[in-house]
Amino acid sequence: MRLIVAFFMALASSLTVAQEMTEMRSEFFYCTLNDGKTMEDVREQSKQYGEFSKENGTHYTQAILLPMHAGETDYDYITWGTWPDGKAMYEEWGSFANNYEAAAEEVTGGAAGTCRNSIATFFNLVARIPMDAAKRDKKSPVQFSRCSLNEGVTLEQVAAQEMENVKQMEDAGFEGLAIAYHVPYMGFNETPDFDFVMNYYWYSFDARAHAAQNYGAFAAENPEGQEAMDELVSCEGTSSFVFETMFNNLPDTEG
């Protein structure tokens, strides 16, 4: 079955508490629009690269993030790309480096944006609550928070507790949520002052609204989940964005 919400569904059927987390790879480019260009130009050029990627058989998916509540920023948008593993990452980069120059010349009007900062992460999908495809939004909300492990705690311990908490949320009627952890990989100018970034993705704004309205009461009735997380990890600096998939050339998967 073709992945609909690319990287948030790719591992969902295989992850369990007992398993070691399977790492995908992500990259983030922080970009500003060039003079006379709009986000429609950005979307069009991304989709054109998606066609190139598809023709060359590389396994890569790309999305655009627009700041929603992200504080003062020095960029207009973020391009977020993901591969299923490290092998696919370097195969796609090799295709881009060696073959895309000629294809890029066919893009009329020049580049839509200038990207001045780029980072790569190890991307671990931890847990998700499904939602019917018909109920999902084309553009959906995501949040990122910087997190530090408490002394002696491992990421696997945090993920195991996260899975328990998300299962409890699902049993309580929440839906349309995926949670992933991004561990710094490359491109960070200084040693990060955090261990990982927690990434919440909602499949629709209605799902996010339901969580905003009901999570407080749920947490009050089930305090043990958050208390357990507080013993493992500390998170701060939450920012929110609008997420929109541009293309998805990840391989077919079951689940």
Set out the residue ranges of the language-model regions:
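Positively charged n-region of N-terminal signal peptides that target proteins for export
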Residues: 1-4
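Short S/T/G/P-rich N-terminal loop/turn motif that feeds into the first structured element of a domain
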Residues: 18-225, 230-255
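N-terminal signal peptide c-region/cleavage motif recognized by signal peptidases
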Residues: 13-17
